[in-house]
C-alpha cells in the first residue's frame, strides 16, 4: 500500500484516522498457536499476533512460520496431549468493568458471565440484559 517505509508522522495520522473510525489495533504476546485442520495440524512457535478491534468485532492476524504435521504421523498419545492442552481465557479488568458499567452487576457476576461467554463482551452484556 505504501512503498518504502512510513515516517512516524504518517503512522500517527493513520492511527488517529483508524481510531476516529472506531478501529483499534494492538500487538499481543503469544507463545504458541495450534490450528487443527481436517488433514493436518499447524503449529506456530512464537508468532506475531495483532488484534484489530473494529466496532466490537475482533480480528486476529497471525504472522510467522507454521510447522505442518500430518494427522496420520501423530501418535495416539500426542493427539491426546494436543486435545488436552487447556486454553487459558484472559479476561481483562477493562472487560469486567465494561460489563459492570453496562449491566450494573457485581464484578464477580460480570467475570462469571464473561467466562461462560468465552470472553465475548457483547454476548455477556446481552445475556445479563435479559
Curated annotation (Swiss-Prot):
Residue stretches making up the NAC-A/B domain: 8-75
Keyword Transport on entry: yes
Family: Belongs to the NAC-alpha family.
Entry function: Contacts the emerging nascent chain on the ribosome.
Subunit structure and binding partners: Homodimer. Interacts with the ribosome. Binds ribosomal RNA.
Any one biological process term the GO annotation gives: protein transport
Name by which UniProt lists this protein: Nascent polypeptide-associated complex protein
Disulfide bonds: none
Amino acid at each position: 500500500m505504501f512503498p518504502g517505509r512510513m515516517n512516524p508522522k504518517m503512522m500517527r495520522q493513520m492511527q488517529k484516522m483508524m481510531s476516529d473510525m472506531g478501529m483499534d489495533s494492538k500487538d499481543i504476546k503469544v507463545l504458541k498457536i495450534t490450528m487443527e485442520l481436517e488433514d493436518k495440524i499447524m503449529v506456530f512457535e512464537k508468532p506475531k499476533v495483532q488484534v484489530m478491534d473494529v466496532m466490537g468485532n475482533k480480528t486476529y492476524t497471525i504472522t510467522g512460520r507454521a510447522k505442518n504435521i500430518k494427522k496420520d504421523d501423530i501418535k495416539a498419545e500426542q493427539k491426546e496431549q494436543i486435545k488436552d492442552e487447556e486454553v487459558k481465557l484472559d479476561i481483562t479488568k477493562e472487560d469486567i468493568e465494561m460489563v459492570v458499567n453496562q449491566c450494573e452487576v457485581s464484578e464477580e457476576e460480570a467475570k462469571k458471565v464473561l467466562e461462560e461467554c468465552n470472553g465475548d463482551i457483547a454476548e455477556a452484556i446481552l445475556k445479563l440484559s435479559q
